[in-house]
Amino acid sequence: MYEGPVQDLIDELGKLPGVGPKSAQRIAFHLLSVEPPEIDRLKNALQRVRDGVQFCVVCGTVSDKEHCRICADPRRDRTVICVVEEPKDVQAVERTREFKGRYHVLGGALDPLSGVGPDQLRIRELLARIGNQEDGVDVSEVIIATDPNTEGEATATYLVRMLRDFPGLTVSRLASGLPMGGDLEFADELTLGRALSGRRTL
């Protein structure tokens, strides 16, 4: 163990997803070796994220405004909603350049063992968006793009059951091709784009 502030920095870095003890130590000593202005830029970026980032009131993705740039864009197709688990999944789908509709971020996936049920996700908000129309336009399709793992499949199954009550609504799921057990954010653009364009109706 290192002394005082150095060990504190390593401990805090080690709490980040995907950062183990050795990586935390390597990052900490990198930060100790850089010039003060670089540290200041990192500190300011963290401060701006803490103070200026919020969640879009419509779709739930991260934004620096009340409405994210996608929800505020009148050119996006309001009749199609792509449902994803996390804001990072929005960026994964956007990179494909295949989807021109809007998104809905659930904020996770169903995981009873971790205490995550329907009430902990933004499912009620999704149903309200469809039931109340999207800016006065009927939603015609919901694409379920949850991760291809146990929790994602359970979430997709639950959503299909909830969405069946809406007459005329098409519910689809990304086509096979994504590796089972993986995360949407790690899929390459080509594979994810093909899964999106080849989606199957449920």
Curated annotation (Swiss-Prot):
UniProt entry tagged with the keyword Coiled coil: no
The organism's place on the tree of life at top rank: Bacteria
Molecular function GO labels: DNA binding; zinc ion binding
Zinc finger (C4-type): 56-71
Keyword Metal-binding recorded: yes
Listed transmembrane segments: none
Keywords, sorted A to Z: DNA damage, DNA recombination, DNA repair, Metal-binding, Zinc, Zinc-finger
Coiled coil (residue ranges): none
GO terms under biological process: DNA recombination; DNA repair
Domain Toprim: 79-179
Entry-linked HAMAP family: RecR
Family: Belongs to the RecR family.
Function: May play a role in DNA repair. It seems to be involved in an RecBC-independent recombinational process of DNA repair. It may act with RecF and RecO.
Name of the protein in its database record: Recombination protein RecR
